[in-house]
Amino acid sequence: MAAPRISFVSLGCPKALVDSERIITSLRSEGYEISRKHQGADLVIVNTCGFLDSARNESLANIDEALKKNGKVIVTGCLGADPDVIRQVYPNVLAITGPQAYESVIQAVHTAIPPVHDPFIDLVPPQGIRLTPRHYAYLKISEGCSNRCSFCIIPTLRGNLMSRPISDVLREAEKLVQAGVKELLVISQDTSAYGIDLKYLETPWKDRTVKTKFFDLCRELGNMGIWIRMHYVYPYPHVDDVIEFMAEKKILPYLDIPFQHASPTVLRNMKRPALVKKINRRIEKWRIICPDLTLRSTFIVGFPGETHEDFNILLEWLDEVKIERAGCFKYEAVKGAVANDLGLESIPEEVKENRWHRFMAKQQKISTHLLKKKVGKRLQVLIDESQGKIAKGRSQYDAPEIDGVVHISSRRPLRVGEFVTVKIERSDAYDLYGIAI
């Protein structure tokens, strides 16, 4: 009997991508084949995003496409936390589950298509099924978030912080390293809060016990001999303690910190930490300890009540702090977010657009200036794409998908997943260009 075939669509953030990998790994272990084509598949699973209206619309469009091309659809993910929204538009979907509802998804698949499992065939590699290239992987250390930012509905969709015991995380990391992964990208909703909900539970690891704690996680991952990149790190005071690991090159000198804004007024309205001057002093301290540190962040412009003065404070802050990598979003009202009920004046779309362009122009100048300082240096680069002697890769300063790249010319063919030393010859606003040596 032919194995049942399932088409899979994964939408949204890296956390959702990890959810998709877990579901696919479970399905493959039971004998299901995974396809990228809806036509000819026995059913389609759509892992949705429901954070912004634009993401909800994209999710609904993908459900619509799956129904038209296949007809049998299971919906999971963040949009599934509000099943009525989906049922009102698409009443014929087979099942709807919320985020991280792995077992419910598998049960829904079993109901629609019973598994055909051959116990004599090893269907799944030790590291599980990955949707990223083989040389890097996302390592999700927790679910949910216990913060209550006024613009965000993640706690509603995914619940409060639920950390994985550190021994589980380290076992997964070790398997990935053994499978050939060269870079682990540590992700969660609030990475630096890791373990707080478990009261820093101690668990056995190899010949010792380790605490389920951000510091211990960084220390242990830093001993695995590969690139470790930290994402979604709130600037809590204890983050200071891990900068030393970066200076020692145990983990990459890279911190992804969602600052969101620099105006204390806007930050208070966002229910975010508003001690900007204190954070600035800590950034100065970090850069003294680790001069090679790269900071990446995201910001929101056009938040309700944001004045011209607030926005100018943000631009001045960019000039002062000079974040190496920054992204910017125009504020979108999210259904169910507290920000909708604060009674603050909405910002017109044309004003949001203007502020977004001004932010990006400012950051582009900063990035251009900072990247020029890399010209003439030799950097270790991990190859992401290769066309023989022409390749693209990333240095320690860049995460996949969201940051810049290094364009490489080489005398020999370069392989995806290998490290090469590159002499940087020129730069532009976001990328570097060099020759492999």
Swiss-Prot record:
Radical SAM core domain ranges (all copies): 131-369
Cofactor note: Binds 2 [4Fe-4S] clusters. One cluster is coordinated with 3 cysteines and an exchangeable S-adenosyl-L-methionine.
SMART domains attached to this UniProt entry: Elp3
Major subcellular location class: cytoplasm
Keyword RNA-binding: no
Gene3D superfamilies: Methylthiotransferase, N-terminal domain, Nucleic acid-binding proteins, tm_1862 like domain
Residue intervals of the TRAM domain: 372-437
Family, as annotated: Belongs to the methylthiotransferase family. RimO subfamily.
NCBIfam families (alphabetical): 30S ribosomal protein S12 methylthiotransferase RimO, MiaB/RimO family radical SAM methylthiotransferase
Protein name per its UniProtKB record: Ribosomal protein uS12 methylthiotransferase RimO
Species per Swiss-Prot/TrEMBL record: Bartonella henselae (strain ATCC 49882 / DSM 28221 / CCUG 30454 / Houston 1)
Gene expressing this chain: rimO
